UniProtKB/Swiss-Prot annotation:
The gene is FADS6. It comes from Homo sapiens. The keyword Transmembrane helix applies. This is Fatty acid desaturase 6. Sequence repeats lie at residues 1-6, 7-12, 13-18. Its EC number is 1.14.19.-. A motif (Histidine box-2) lies at residues 139-143. Pfam families: FA_desaturase. It comes from the Eukaryota.
């Protein structure tokens, strides 16, 4: 369901100005969440396998099947065809690494635990060049369990106070293709030897396969040009990827670990949906772009199911007079440029909810 009138972005609140509770707060956050879960489960039960998993699996399969066309386009000297190859490879790369890894991390691609593990290793380690264990721990066990709780799931890993607003917003995203495998290798010190060796092998397989295909299929003549093309395709959507990760949580209410609200209040206050953007919805997935609130409330739902339950969730939250944060990419971009010091450099103020 498209928002008819986007809400203004929620501003951080000082602890001396506590937020007023919703009128339905006396019913308790747990009761509200159970009521919403029943409504969502009714939608899930009446949905086919195609709706629950098939649509997203088809998008990922299409991205894999489109890779040969992208590599072959790079053989052409025609600038338009070459640019098409870069675009195909870049969009497919982000579809596999962001959408695929995100769904695999949550076990939303299949109901089989064995296949969930296989897809997790493939998308996170082979495609993304990161560690499956740290992706699961950092994203699922910390960010989702403690959304916007300062020091736990507050998205602070995305803050780089040493950079000014223009360097961060425009230049820092280019570091992502290089920083991702380097961070992964650094974190291997904290895992068992067998796990570290497996991760190194899978990351190396993914990176070398990309490099080998550029040399042997795309026809690049020297290693430096192949590495440059790897960097170009892997950074194609790096800017919106970094921006989205900060737009949807930072600048919204933050909570202390000792006084965090109930789950439904935490997610409705601390999560924001962006307006639908076709390319980003395709490459990153609805659960990251336009259905992020729904995803945080029901993280095991696939992207397509998050989109399907969105009308139910948005109507329920509004009927119960709970926040349902929505904004456009451009509006958040302008807001972060204007208030970068407050959002990305200074310590976030703590929001206290009176009566919840």
């Amino acid at each position: 369901m498209e928002p008819t009138e986007p809400m203004e972005p929620t501003e951080p609140m000082e602890p001396t100005e506590p937020m007023e509770p919703a009128r339905s707060a006396h019913r308790g956050g747990e009761a509200l969440l159970r009521e919403l879960e029943v409504l969502v489960q009714d939608v899930v039960r009446t949905s086919s396998w195609w709706e629950r998993h098939g649509v997203d699996c088809a998008i990922l399969a299409l991205s894999l099947f489109a890779l040969p066309a992208g590599f072959l386009c790079l053989r052409w000297e025609n600038a338009l065809v070459f640019a098409s190859g870069i675009t195909i490879l870049g969009v497919c790369h982000y579809t596999l690494t962001v959408k695929g890894s995100h769904l695999a991390t949550h076990g939303a691609l299949t109901e089989s635990k064995r296949w969930s593990k296989i897809w997790l290793l493939f998308f996170v380690e082979v495609c993304t060049a990161f560690t499956a264990e740290h992706a699961t721990h950092g994203h699922v066990k910390m960010h989702h369990a403690y959304t916007n709780v300062v020091g736990l799931g507050d998205s602070s890993t995305w803050r780089l106070p040493c950079l000014n607003r223009y360097v961060y917003m425009f230049l820092a995203p280019f570091l992502l293709p290089i920083a991702t495998p380097l961070v992964a290798v650094e974190r291997l010190r904290k895992v068992e030897l067998g796990t570290a060796l497996r991760t190194l092998a899978l990351i190396s397989l993914g990176l070398y396969s990309h490099y080998w295909l550029l040399l042997n299929v795309s026809g690049f003549k020297n290693p430096s040009s192949a590495l440059g093309c790897m960097f170009l395709t892997r950074s194609l959507l790096a800017h919106p990827y970094l921006h989205v990760n900060i737009f949807q949580h930072i600048g919204l209410p933050m909570f202390s670990r000792d006084n965090k609200p109930r789950r439904i209040h935490m997610m409705s206050l601390g999560v924001l949906n962006l307006a639908r953007l076709p390319v980003l919805d395709w490459a990153f997935g609805h659960s990251i772009i336009s259905c992020h609130v729904e995803h945080h409330l029901f993280p095991r739902l696939s992207d397509n199911m998050c989109l399907k339950v969105k009308p139910v969730v948005s109507q329920f939250l509004r009927e119960k007079q709970l926040p349902y944060n929505e904004d456009s990419y451009l509006a958040r971009f302008q807001l972060f440029l204007r208030r970068y010091e407050e959002f990305m450099v200074q310590a976030p103020p703590i929001t206290e909810l009176v009566g919840l």
